[in-house]
Amino acid sequence: MGNAAAAKKGSEQESVKEFLAKAKEEFLKKWESPSQNTAQLDHFDRIKTLGTGSFGRVMLVKHKETGNHYAMKILDKQKVVKLKQIEHTLNEKRILQAVNFPFLVKLEFSFKDNSNLYMVMEYVPGGEMFSHLRRIGRFSEPHARFYAAQIVLTFEYLHSLDLIYRDLKPENLLIDQQGYIQVTDFGFAKRVKGRTWTLCGTPEYLAPEIILSKGYNKAVDWWALGVLIYEMAAGYPPFFADQPIQIYEKIVSGKVRFPSHFSSDLKDLLRNLLQVDLTKRFGNLKNGVNDIKNHKWFATTDWIAIYQRKVEAPFIPKFKGPGDTSNFDDYEEEEIRVSINEKCGKEFTEF
């Protein structure tokens, strides 16, 4: 690298530091005094279910007064308690209301009633990366790199706030109207200084240290990035099998096979991300995220332009207007029932 290039890189890294310091101030203000009860259910018309989960659903809604569309996540308090997800749910809302980054879905309102918790988020009509990846088969390396760069920047932001994301997978990445990523579902995100021990995540994406019940840190997100990049470029994840236990055996073995079409730079990056030895895993070394950002596979990536959303996206989802749901699957609709008596009041005081 010439002197001029090195100087440019140095000043870029300095300005990133300043940016992150300011971002942390803004985050901490909201983290310490979270917003509460900023809307209510009858402010919205419910249109259609976009997805379902074990203790709730996500619905497309329309704000009656403004006509804006949102995605409303509805969580049944009793089910959350039964599935021991109180802590995770409180984390999710507290984190979402405090973060602010171009590739994180925005929480617009949150509130609760006798039966449910509600998080109302920006609606991202392009649907999940998962469905586009399955339809196309696999993404070209430039296409995969465009998405990977956004995740790298997002993790750099989150980790600087001591947040671990812990649930990276194509199902949690939505594609917006400009073809950029919106990361959604902060159900497993957690503010951690040092290490944590909870077993959570999706089998194919779990880092070896989580499977081995070791204390783990932010490095699990960099492992998951390796899994995601592999899956985007191959069309299938690096470790898969019929049963989770077989997947876990493959993950901890540290053996990865690459499709013959992977470039040598891609294989090199993935060997450094899918690295069982934490003292060698990229993102976890003394240069932190810069080992990833400066890797040859990302040589053509203009990080600032990606952050500013100035790079032309390789793919724009088809979309017919603000309330279009054609990029989402259909689900059986269910009435939202609200009890006349308060359920689980004290468990969710801080929501």
Curated annotation (Swiss-Prot):
Protein kinase domain sequence ranges: 44-298
Keyword set includes Plastid: no
AGC-kinase C-terminal domain boundaries: 299-351
Post-translational modification: Autophosphorylated. Phosphorylation is enhanced by vitamin K(2). Phosphorylated on threonine and serine residues. Phosphorylation on Thr-198 is required for full activity. Phosphorylated at Tyr-331 by activated receptor tyrosine kinases EGFR and PDGFR; this increases catalytic efficiency. When myristoylated, Ser-11 is autophosphorylated probably in conjunction with deamidation of Asn-3.
Regulation: Allosterically activated by various compounds, including ATP. Activated by cAMP; the nucleotide acts as a dynamic and allosteric activator by coupling the two lobes of apo PKA, enhancing the enzyme dynamics synchronously and priming it for catalysis.
InterPro entries, per the entry: AGC-kinase_C (IPR000961), Kinase-like_dom_sf (IPR011009), Prot_kinase_dom (IPR000719), Protein_kinase_ATP_BS (IPR017441), Ser/Thr_kinase_AS (IPR008271), STKc_PKA (IPR044109)
Catalytic EC class: transferase
Lipidation sites (N-myristoyl glycine): 2
Modified residues (Phosphotyrosine): 331
GO biological process, one term: negative regulation of glycolytic process through fructose-6-phosphate
UniProt keyword annotation of Kinase present: yes
Protein function: Phosphorylates a large number of substrates in the cytoplasm and the nucleus. Phosphorylates CDC25B, ABL1, NFKB1, CLDN3, PSMC5/RPT6, PJA2, RYR2, RORA, SOX9 and VASP. Regulates the abundance of compartmentalized pools of its regulatory subunits through phosphorylation of PJA2 which binds and ubiquitinates these subunits, leading to their subsequent proteolysis. RORA is activated by phosphorylation. Required for glucose-mediated adipogenic differentiation increase and osteogenic differentiation inhibition from osteoblasts. Involved in chondrogenesis by mediating phosphorylation of SOX9.
Self-association and partners: A number of inactive tetrameric holoenzymes are produced by the combination of homo- or heterodimers of the different regulatory subunits associated with two catalytic subunits. cAMP causes the dissociation of the inactive holoenzyme into a dimer of regulatory subunits bound to four cAMP and two free monomeric catalytic subunits. Activates cAMP-sensitive PKAI and PKAII holoenzymes by interacting with regulatory subunit (R) of PKA, PRKAR1A/PKR1 and PRKAR2A/PKR2, respectively. Interacts with NFKB1, NFKB2 and NFKBIA in platelets; these interactions are disrupted by thrombin and collagen.
Protein name from the UniProt record: cAMP-dependent protein kinase catalytic subunit alpha
Native organism: Cricetulus griseus
Organism lineage: Eukaryota, Metazoa, Chordata, Craniata, Vertebrata
